Amino acid sequence: MLHKKETNDTFVQLNRSPSTGEQKSSGIWSSIKDSFKPALPQDKLTGVDDIPDRELTDIERININAANSNLQRKLKTRHLQMIAIGSSIGTGLFVGTGGALSTGGPAAIVLAWAISAISVFMTMQGLGELAVAFPVSGGFNLYASKFLEPGIGFAVGWNYFLQFFVLLPLELVAGAITIKYWNASINSDVFVIIFWFVVLVITMLGVRWYGEAELVFCTIKVIAVIGFIILGIVLICGGGPNHEFIGGKYWREPGPFANSFKGFASSLITAAFSFGGTEMIALTASESSNVRHALPKAIKQVFWRIVIFYLGSIIMIATLVPYNDKRLLGSSSVDVTASPFTIAIVNGGIKGLPSVINAVILISVLSVGNASVYATSRTLNSLAEQGMAPKWTGYIDRAGRPLFAILITNVFGLFALIAADNEKQVVAFNWLLALSGLSSIFTWMSINLSHIRFRRAMKVQNRSLTELPFVAQSGVWGSYFGLTLNILYLIAQFYIGLFPVGGKPNAYDFFLAYLGVPVILASWIGYKIWKRDWTLFIRAKDIDLDTGRINVDLDLLQQEIAEEKAQLAEKPFYIRIYRFWC
């Protein structure tokens, strides 16, 4: 049974400082210096009050450490909602869609993004249910250890860490290339350093400033996407400077599909990867000031982001840009000149706006770089708390920053200085990306499986869903559906890796596309050998459903939910529909 706890203000009193005269001036520097000291203990989540006086098992220690994290809850509702909306609106949408259009054609990319959107929505619903009930450090990384078994948590956690660890220098390179849109003679290294310093400052200011920065970045991205959709409708209807009615012109010629089924499979993989980062909302749960109300709203925002921002943009791109446009050929995740957003505006005869779109792409690059440091540092901190990474990497200072994890990630970002200019180093960089290339798919699969096992444990242990502050709208079957689609992604990636579009089968392309599979298997097997633990999964009756749970008075919770339902029942049907999705 869960119990409501009294708030302990002891540490609030300790942090108060004099505010008069010279004391205020010296107090600022003292506060900065003191902020790097070890964190003060935080209030515990439920399930950790009565620790048995015996040697703990690995899974018990993992659950208890995650529930006692010293990360600070400073993210507000506005931060979570914008992070949920904008966490994956980046170069994957603004640039990566160009390559998918060239490979698959307009119908293929619309279908691919629609299928991926459904998959992500189902997965995020299950993740939301877990994250609201268990707002612990590490999020889905911890859920894999808690509801599946620690070996899977180890493999998924380290692969997720590596994915975003390598992403920071990639985004810095993308930022430098974006600048060259205006002046090709500019030295890339100068802007790599500038962008790196901006990311360093934001991430070192703490989680609250990360939230504020993302609020600004995401607002700009959202405005840009909505503006592009409106502009796209105008251009399609012939309202542009060229006064040419486009309609379904490019769907008829050159046609709806390119490269038949193989092109569609390739587009499906690109679509899935473009949603990478959506799951990051779960990492914010342990630093949210109001998990009970803020996180469900943020999770529901996924629906609107998918429908409006992604599918809306994809339909505009598919209608305004022919898939055989030569500017799309050879497009990559960092080549902004191949952005279908830019091409669509240029084709429409509009001057000036391409520079605006590229400025938005530049902001997206900074946003994703900023988010990559956040994801990497929190994941590494969680792994350290679980005993799966060196203990010192989990150091949290008094400002609530996983300090060493942040510094490690930012220092590695300087690898972009090498990757920006040296072709041989770029090859090595691509192989580093390949190591974790399928990390998002594995992470989503672990979320699906964790939710399925959580629901199974609830049933076996005779626990009611009324205990949960938030219940997935898609239920447990949504997680089964998401798991099935994620398995299909792996099959499609294997197929495309073995038989690449427009090329002959070769070992280089195959391993570049599928290296993530043997890497994650090796990680899992390595953990088993290291721990000498050959348990394949935790039995449902043995899954700990209490440690790390949010502090909730169950009677009060059920009363609040009943009152909310009663009030909603009195509203018009359109309000009820809105509240269901928002």
UniProtKB/Swiss-Prot annotation:
The chain crosses the membrane at residues 82-102, 120-142, 150-170, 190-210, 216-236, 263-283, 302-322, 343-363, 402-422, 427-447, 481-501, 510-530. GO terms for biological process: amino acid transmembrane transport; amino acid transport; filamentous growth; filamentous growth of a population of unicellular organisms. It is found in: Cell membrane. Residues 1-28 are annotated as: Disordered. Keywords: Amino-acid transport, Cell membrane, Glycoprotein, Membrane, Transmembrane, Transmembrane helix, Transport. One of its GO terms (molecular function) is amino acid transmembrane transporter activity. This is Amino-acid permease GAP1. It comes from Candida albicans (strain SC5314 / ATCC MYA-2876) (Yeast).
